Design a protein with these regions (language model features):
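A glycine/threonine-rich phosphate-anchoring loop and its flanking beta-alpha core
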Residues: 100-198
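N-terminal loops that bind phosphate or other acidic moieties
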Residues: 44-45, 74, 95, 112, ...
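ATP/NTP phosphate-donor binding region
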Residues: 1-79
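Short Gly/Thr/Asp-enriched flexible loops that form oxyanion-binding sites at enzyme active sites
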Residues: 39, 69, 88-102, 134-135
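Buried hydrophobic packing segments
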Residues: 68, 91-96, 187-188, 208-214
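Active-site segments that bind and position negatively charged phosphate/pyrophosphate groups
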Residues: 190-223
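Glycine/serine-rich anion-binding loops at beta->alpha junctions
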Residues: 77-93, 126-128
């Protein structure tokens, strides 16, 4: 995991360790908020060969995953770069998990578990809502019945996560409000948990206090 401000400018340096040709699974909303070029420019500067898959309008469903998987195989990619929120990251995870398998997405949704080595997956989250980033199970929509199913993937499928705080700061106001509310709920849930400790309570209380400052429109989070 790489954390920090403007670390996305070095993403091309990181991905070079995993190959030279990639498929970039990107949330189309990033173009609207001016983040797409910010992420792709470092790849262009270091001549990283890539193509973009951004047809994510219907969520992480099996049809889009099947389409992305076919494009990845036809493009002989050596890795997947996922940019965006949970939707983009889940689709990219499914493609990486299935790339070297002889069966498809619907076999996995019906219970078949991938066993071959997954394609290297590099994630660049643009939100803090990434609960399945390092989880061997991801939720997907089965287009046959329009129901959410859990797909098992290989452990440690995400080889690298580049988390840049400036990407989150560029979100729309509605996205920021949604993320803030969910994060506040997580803090409250953790505080009330039976597994809570003195230290976890301290972090939860401090996070709730900081959110209070932020939601009140404070220019500074200094307490």
């Amino acid at each position: 995991v790489v954390l920090g401000s403007y670390v996305v400018t070095r993403v091309s340096q990181y991905v070079k360790e995993y190959g030279s040709r990639f498929m970039v699974v990107m949330d189309p909303v990033l173009k609207d908020v001016g983040l797409a070029d910010k992420i792709l420019q470092p790849l262009n500067e270091r001549n990283v060969d890539y193509f973009i898959f951004d047809e994510l309008n219907d969520g992480a469903n099996s049809k889009q995953i099947q389409q992305a998987l076919e494009l990845a195989k036809q493009g002989y990619v050596q890795g997947i770069i996922a940019v965006g929120g949970t939707k983009a990251l889940n689709i990219a995870s499914a493609v990486a998990a299935l790339f070297n398998e002889s069966f498809g997405i619907y076999d996995c949704l019906d219970g078949t578990v991938p066993t071959k080595e997954a394609l290297p997956l590099i994630c660049v989250p643009t939100t803090i809502r990434i609960p399945f980033l390092f989880n061997p199970v991801i939720p997907l929509i089965d287009a046959r019945c329009n129901q959410i199913k859990l797909m098992k993937v290989q452990k440690e499928i995400c080889k690298l996560a580049v988390m840049d705080s400036t990407l989150i700061a560029s979100l729309t106001e509605n996205q920021k409000s949604s993320i803030s509310l969910e994060t506040l709920c997580i803090a409250v849930e953790a505080y009330l948990s039976q597994k809570a400790s003195f230290f976890s309570d301290m972090f939860c209380e401090k996070s709730a206090e900081l959110f209070g400052y932020a939601l009140d429109g404070s220019k500074s989070l200094e307490i």
